[in-house]
Design a protein with these regions (language model features):
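Generic detector of intrinsically disordered, low-complexity, polar/charged segments
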Residues: 82, 108, 139-141, 206, ...
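Exposed acidic/Ser/Thr-rich ligand/metal-binding surfaces
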Residues: 1-191, 245-249, 340
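Generic preference for hydrophobic
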Residues: 44, 204-207
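Long, C-terminal catalytic modules of enzymes
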Residues: 192-195, 199-201
């Protein structure tokens, strides 16, 4: 992969002093310092009521101890001014911008802004302009069980990135050893998916989630309209609840995926169709295991939000299905879902 130029923007406000927050951030950044290559570069910005550059853009080679020292010196302070932190972080990222490198801002915060521009308009404008002019993207890491996920997601959506969550050292290793290094190099930029249902066979359909990531039909092939980014080994799942017409037979939907090559910006498209025979069996019967896992997670999340998805099983049944799937898939994340 090309070298990475990463700017870490770390929330050191009072709310980050709670158990498993700032200390976990320190451990996370030290883990990543060990994983990055010698030709990668990092800078470090912290923020509470104001922002401070703790480390300007620094090459990893010969400087790992210097980087660890800057990370270990972080201490919790006062209120949270996310605007100040992100503005300073993007200044550092632009100043340390490297042609041909993957330039990224990594925000680590509980995202509970309480001073500065909490409506985020100034922040969003800055994130968008840096993305367009310099190709700088944003990776958001939520810390703490009460982190402001909706606010964090707004920021990363504008920054052509995505969010993840860290709650313990095991998750930190997964994010900073597996996820972040994989996403330093993109496989697809501004990826979009469109599903067209056939009204002759489909009575009702509903997209589950993605409320703030919907793209208008007329914007699907407009490559100036922001999509999502996909890294190596990264999968994106969109689930639909579908009700067929009685006695329906034939094509149910046509799904199309469109994306840009990260280097050439050339657009590509691929399409596929789904027919009634593919969805005649019950979900819990012969459906692929990963689809069942996704369904359990979606039903569980919708229940927590007070949703009304048709056919939602009771929590006890969801837990039972998750436990069964955990034993069949030998997947640690499914085991955690079963005990959530």
């Amino acid at each position: 992969r090309p070298p990475a130029s990463l700017t870490f923007v770390v929330d050191i406000s009072g709310s980050m002093a709670g158990p498993g927050r700032l200390e976990l951030v320190r451990k996370s950044l030290n883990i990543l310092t060990d994983e990055l290559r010698d030709d990668d570069s990092v800078s470090l910005v912290t923020f509470s009521d104001k922002a401070e550059t703790r480390l300007p853009m620094t090459r990893l080679k010969g400087n790992r101890n210097k980087i660890r020292d800057a990370v270990d010196e972080m201490r919790p302070a006062r209120s949270t001014n996310v605007e100040a932190g992100i503005m300073r972080g993007y200044e550092e990222s632009v100043e340390g911008h490297r042609e041909g490198a993957n330039n990224r801002v990594v925000l680590l915060s509980d995202a509970l802004a309480n001073t500065g521009d909490t409506k985020a308009e100034n922040i969003l404008e800055r994130i968008d302009s840096a993305r367009r002019e310099y190709g700088i993207t944003l990776f958001g890491v939520g810390v703490g069980s009460e982190y402001g996920d909706a606010f964090m997601e707004r920021l990363t959506n504008k920054g052509d990135g995505h969010t993840t969550y860290v709650g313990d050292e095991e998750q930190a290793r997964k994010v900073f050893v597996d996820q972040l290094p994989a996403h330093i190099q993109l496989r697809a930029r501004d990826a979009k998916a469109q599903v067209a249902f056939d009204r002759k066979t489909v009575k009702q359909f509903r997209l589950i989630g993605y409320e703030n990531r919907k793209v208008a039909d007329e914007d699907f092939r407009d490559d100036s309209v922001d999509g999502g980014e996909v890294g190596p080994g990264h999968t994106v799942t969109a689930l639909y609840a579908v009700r067929l017409r009685e006695g329906a037979s034939g094509e149910v939907a046509k799904a199309t995926v469109r994306w840009l090559d990260p280097e050439t910006r050339k657009a590509y498209e691929e399409s596929g169709t789904v027919r009634t025979g593919a969805i005649e069996d019950t979900l819990w019967g012969s459906a692929p295991q990963r689809l069942q896992v996704a369904a359990v997670a979606a039903y569980f999340a919708d229940t927590l939000r007070g949703g009304d998805l048709p056919g939602t099983p009771a929590l006890r049944e969801l837990a039972s299905r998750a436990t069964k799937l955990a034993s069949e898939t030998d997947d640690d994340s499914v085991r955690k879902l079963a005990t959530a």
